[in-house]
Structures are given as C-alpha cells and as structure tokens.
C-alpha cells in the first residue's frame, strides 16, 4: 500500500479528476467545472483564522493548486495556492460572478452536521454578501445525517426518503425534480 500522505494526495487527485469527469457524463463541459482543492476537515480552522493558511491533516500539503490542475481557468486562490478562508471567499465570488447561477444548492447545516459542509454553506453566504450577482433560489440538502453517515439509504434507482427534521423552528420545504431519461 501507499504511505498515508501519498494515499491522501492520491485521493485528492482522484476527487479532482471526478469533479471534471462526472459532470461530463451529464453533458457539462470542462470549462464549466472547477475544483477548489481545499483540504478535508480544515474549513472550520480556516474560518476561525481567515488569513492564516491551514494545511492538510493527511496529505502533507499546504498548497491547493495540485488539485486544481484540471481547471480550465484560474481562480484568485491560484496566485499563491494558500488554503485560507479569504482565498476560499475570493474563489467563490469569482465562480459566482462567472457562472451567475439562478439556483445554488448547498448542504443545510440543520440536517447535515459535517463541519466542512456547515462551513462551506457559511462561506457561500459570506461570499454572496455585497456581490453584484445574487441567485434567486437557494436550496438545502443533506449529505450526512446527525446520527449516521449512511444517508440516503436504499438501492440504486429506488426512492429516497426525506431527511428527518431536527429543528422544528425551521421552515423546510421538500423539493422534488422529475428527471427523464433524456
């Protein structure tokens, strides 16, 4: 097997590759995709000290550019590759202005407790502050649940139950989009 740091770098490179290849299966051109390359479980530390670089825990790296090699365009964080909250915000602002999305879909912190997902949502909201482009709709979803890491459960092509509501004070509305084979 690989050494731990080498395995972590390989996993990151595979994720970068997936971020380009998987959308292509759906007909999304590479020029519309970007990999940010920030490190797993480091977003809370980045948020706590916005101008301080936060290196990878596993990959022995402190430069995000290794994982951006497939990007078709440069982002602000590519200037120094520093994994900081401020670079993340600058990257998000650049992507939002480039894509001008009408809809943004994010993990919802009330139903997805993963610390990186919570911080990613906070980063998008912070990046949107004062930005000349604003989406018309923001949707939330759960990738991880509070009590387990196995949701959504079930067989491929089966229906998926809605995630449980953990905070009754929130107004969460289900959204289901019908897909065709085309």
Predicted regions and their residues:
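Metal-dependent de-N-acetylase/amidase catalytic core
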Residues: 2-18, 25-30, 35, 39-182
């Amino acid at each position: 097997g690989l050494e731990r740091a080498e395995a972590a770098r390989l996993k990151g490179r595979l994720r970068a590759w997936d971020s380009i290849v998987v959308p292509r299966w759906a007909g999304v051109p590479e020029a519309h995709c970007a990999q940010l390359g920030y490190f797993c479980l480091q977003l809370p530390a980045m948020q706590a000290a916005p101008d301080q670089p936060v290196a990878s825990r596993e990959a022995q790296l402190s430069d995000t550019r290794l994982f951006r090699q497939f990007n078709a365009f440069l982002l602000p964080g590519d200037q120094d590759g520093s994994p900081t909250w401020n670079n993340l915000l600058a990257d998000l602002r650049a992507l939002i202005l480039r894509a001008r999305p009408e809809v943004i879909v994010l993990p919802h912190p009330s139903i997805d407790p993963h610390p990186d997902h919570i911080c990613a949502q906070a980063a998008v909201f912070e990046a949107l502050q004062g930005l000349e482009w604003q989406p018309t709709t923001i949707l939330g979803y759960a990738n991880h649940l509070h009590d387990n890491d196995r949701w959504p459960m079930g067989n491929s092509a089966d229906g998926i139950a809605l995630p449980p509501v953990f905070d009754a004070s929130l107004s969460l509305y289900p959204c289901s989009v019908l897909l065709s084979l085309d």
